[in-house]
Amino acid sequence: YQYPMATDSNLVYNHEKGNDNDGSAFTSFIESSPIDIQDGDQFVFLRRMIPDISFANSDANIDPNTKKAIFSLKAQRNPNEGFVKTSSNTVLSTTELNHLRLRGRSFGLRVESTDQGVNWRLGVPRVDIRADGDR
């Protein structure tokens, strides 16, 4: 069988088939742990990002220009503090570069989508990271 199957009460359920929750959209996401340079001794400045995402295997009836995901970069000053600044950018399959301005001791990346019928696969996003001083 191509997909996992389960039974209960004389019914057979076909799991993990399709891109939605039985016809309803659901939030899918992946999130990194905090990333720093030089063991967090130095602040970083994030200037731009090249997203690497594919929307292959999305439902066929979706316009290719509307398939999207939200890339959120979050910065924090200290490990025990929450993230204080966020830069969120909508990324389409045609997006080549996102400009942003974030600084902190560490940062994290979250990619999410809430659209119905959209399937995405994350590659290796590239972020322009520069060492920056504390202000």
Predicted ranges, named:
Residues 1-135:
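Beta-sheet repeat architectures centered on beta-propellers
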